[in-house]
Amino acid sequence: FKCDWSSDVCSSDLGVLGGHWTRNLAADSKGTLYVAIGSNGNINDHDDPHRAAVSVVEPNGKLTQYATGLRNPVGITFYPGTDDLYVVVNERDGEGDELVPDYLTHVEKGAFYGWPYAYLGQHEEPSLKGKRPDLVAKAKVPDVLFRSHSAPLGLLFYTGTQFPAEYRGGAFVAHHGSWNAANPRGYKI
């Protein structure tokens, strides 16, 4: 990745402000820059290809989709020593206290993770039923589920030796906690 550092802007192609628009960055071993940008709403169709997605920032400043269907991908990082990309995602609200689980997942190039048409693989979003069966059919199941509305924000893979051996190679995920669950949850690592 090359950027004209005489400017403070490497890309202005981040879409319209609003919703879950403040984002995180990660760079792979080759210096390619990835940006996670959340949706512009809770459960809605959208026409901005860079929202609810992870994109690559091209040398010319334009964004190229890497993976889509990620409602609010917040924590983004590469597994240490690899170019394996992972994110933690805050899923949709309004489906009840126990749906839809937030998650951590390995992000694959070209993959679709469900939002807004499906969740947990091919479980169709009731309010958008029948709208995009093609996307529902290819929606990926996340790798690790967290309790709904726990709001995972930070993600760090642990390779140190300070903690017991069973933690090595695992992930620490910081949860912000719920704002809308009947019984608060989250607020933990």
Model-derived features: where do they sit?
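Conserved donor sugar-nucleotide recognition element shared by glycan-biosynthetic enzymes
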Residues: 18, 46-47
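Conserved beta-strand positions that form and line the central face of beta-propeller blades
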Residues: 10, 65-66
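Acidic/polar residues in short coil/turn loops that connect beta-strands
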Residues: 4, 28-30, 59-60, 81
